[in-house]
A protein has these predicted regions:
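Hydrophobic membrane-targeting segments
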Residues: 7-110, 256
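Long, non-globular segments of proteins
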Residues: 1-2
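Helix-termination/interfacial motifs at the ends of transmembrane alpha-helices
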Residues: 8-16, 36-56, 62-63, 72, ...
Length: 283
């Protein structure tokens, strides 16, 4: 059986092993359930208000006040808290990925940082390049610093040939990059999974709503108009929630994937410049 994975190779199973991920999902569900029952399901949102509780009127018989969208969403049924959970998880991990990628970028603009490194390397100013990495911080700076330290060591190593030194420098870059990139793509699989399952959960709610609607039509005599309207409303609300979650999931996944691709390109560009500089200066 195949597993959902993101471009960094992380599967949904790996993501769910994280205590942070599990805590976010559980907390999101509890918040969604609380909002659904206590805020959306508050009797003041329905015709009759507090009298609905006093008269013990079943919640499926409650009728939303005109224009009260909280009550309308509440009538979407028990699938609504699941869809709200999906949205909360999506928002949480979108923010988490944004913070992580911002930290990985470091303190300054990456394009300026890469150009400065290229200038330092062209003039064989290795110490200045290392100092720039310490100032920039972030994943790209970490990779470049590892390469620059190896560069400095190889310059003084007389036991290796030029080709061996170049291979050693390239290997150092590959190892440093392999340590940094997984951090950027971690939990990205959560966003891609939400993009896939949100619309399916919404479809489940749609089916349940239509079952209720057709059940009202199947009654002998005049159909129950209230039950029919409730069923159709439930179906449409779940459809809207499901599509919204899927749409946002796709947008956020593609947005962060593009940022990671751009980040990876800058790492490759800077690494290539360092190797070329070393090859040109090494005799």
């Amino acid at each position: 059986m195949s597993k959902t994975t993101n471009k960094g190779g992380q599967s949904i199973g790996d993501a769910l092993k994280s205590w942070f991920t599990i805590a976010v999902i559980i907390l999101s569900f509890l918040i969604a359930l609380l909002v659904y029952l206590k805020i959306m399901g508050n009797p003041i949102n329905f015709e009759g208000g507090a009298d609905l509780i006093k008269n013990k009127v079943p919640s499926d018989k409650w009728h939303p006040l005109p224009g009260n969208y909280l009550a309308m969403v509440y009538k979407g049924g028990l699938i609504v808290p699941l869809l709200m959970t999906v949205l909360l998880v999506l928002f949480t991990f979108s923010i988490e990925r944004g913070i992580t990628i911002a930290r990985a970028s470091g303190k300054g603009k990456l394009n300026v940082f890469v150009k400065n490194l290229q200038n330092y390397l062209a003039n064989d100013k290795i110490e200045d390049a290392i100092a720039a990495c310490d100032k920039q911080k972030g994943s790209l700076a970490n990779v470049m610093k590892a390469g620059l330290l190896r560069y400095r060591t190889l310059q003084k190593d007389a036991t290796l040939s030029k080709d061996q030194k170049i291979l050693a420098l390239q290997k150092e870059f590959e190892e440093a990059t392999a340590l940094e990139l997984p951090m950027l793509s971690r939990n990205l699989v959560i966003l891609s999974t939400i993009a896939s399952i949100s619309v399916l959960i919404g479809l489940l709610g749609t089916v349940l709503g239509m079952i209720r609607a057709f059940g009202a039509l199947a009654q002998a005599g005049a159909p129950d108009a209230l039950a029919l309207a409730t069923g159709i409303s439930e179906a449409l609300i779940n459809t809207a929630f499901g599509i919204t979650g899927s749409l946002l999931g796709i947008v956020m996944y593609n947005f962060y994937s593009t940022q990671i691709d751009s980040f990876t390109y800058k790492i490759d560009e800077a690494g290539f410049s360092l190797v070329q500089s070393f090859a040109a200066q090494e005799k």
